[in-house]
């Protein structure tokens, strides 16, 4: 199994999403010969999307014109990220919710994956995903409460966005491990961590 592990939190060792993503990877790789590729997108400081940073397979990448050494390195990095994603059997993502949505570094990574002809195509009936055979597990962490019973579900644009972009690429059944209410007091945080850790152990290995 080829497993791609992505972390995005800016909190380093204090990050709950990092803890949970690591637990998920440990759960999936225990007793296996998995090949794990790890990327810490917070540390990599991915630049936002431009024609120069698009993967070379993207039709709009030619708009960049001649690339200097810095731009060539950025494009090569984008190419590697796209191929890592396409080549992975399983993808594990740690995704904290920042200001109601995903971290900008995670968005920058996803922007490099949405490439026509590689991860989706436009067919007679609209977009068709091309990487539907992949398993994707996302550890989502939230400081507040945004579930249906909270009254704030309309402000939740992290899990909802991830479901949308993954489905666009053909991944229609992503799995989510959720820890929320982490900033709502020690009791709520402890309960959320206990529940999320238990959910990790219930994942099919």
Curated annotation (Swiss-Prot):
Note describing how the cofactor binds: Binds 1 FMN per subunit.
Gene3D superfamilies cross-referenced by the UniProt entry: 3.40.50.360
Single GO MF annotation: electron transfer activity
Catalytic reaction list: 2 a quinone + NADH + H(+) = 2 a 1,4-benzosemiquinone + NAD(+); N,N-dimethyl-1,4-phenylenediamine + anthranilate + 2 NAD(+) = 2-(4-dimethylaminophenyl)diazenylbenzoate + 2 NADH + 2 H(+)
Residue ranges of the TM segments: none
CC cofactor: FMN
Subunit structure: Homodimer.
General function of this protein: Quinone reductase that provides resistance to thiol-specific stress caused by electrophilic quinones. Also exhibits azoreductase activity. Catalyzes the reductive cleavage of the azo bond in aromatic azo compounds to the corresponding amines.
This protein's name: FMN-dependent NADH:quinone oxidoreductase
Organism: Methylobacterium nodulans (strain LMG 21967 / CNCM I-2342 / ORS 2060)
């Amino acid at each position: 199994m080829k497993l791609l592990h992505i972390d995005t939190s800016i909190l380093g060792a204090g990050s709950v999403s990092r803890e949970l993503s690591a637990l998920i990877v440990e759960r999936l790789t225990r007793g296996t010969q998995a090949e794990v590729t790890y990327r810490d997108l917070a540390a990599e400081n991915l630049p936002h999307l431009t024609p120069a940073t698009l993967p070379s397979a993207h039709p709009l990448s030619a708009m960049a014109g001649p690339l200097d050494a810095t731009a060539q390195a950025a494009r090569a990095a984008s190419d590697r990220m796209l191929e890592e994603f396409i080549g992975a059997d399983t993808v594990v993502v740690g995704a904290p919710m920042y200001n109601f949505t995903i971290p900008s570094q995670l968005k920058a990574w996803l922007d490099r994956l949405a490439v026509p002809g590689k991860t989706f195509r436009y067919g007679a009936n609209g977009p068709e995903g091309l990487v539907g055979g992949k398993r994707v597990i996302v550890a989502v962490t939230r400081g507040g409460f945004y579930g249906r019973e909270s009254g704030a579900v309309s402000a939740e644009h992290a899990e909802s966005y991830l479901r949308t972009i993954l489905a666009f690429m053909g991944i229609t059944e992503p799995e989510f491990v959720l820890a929320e209410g982490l900033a709502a007091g020690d009791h709520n945080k402890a309960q959320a961590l206990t529940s999320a850790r238990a959910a990790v152990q219930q994942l099919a290995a």
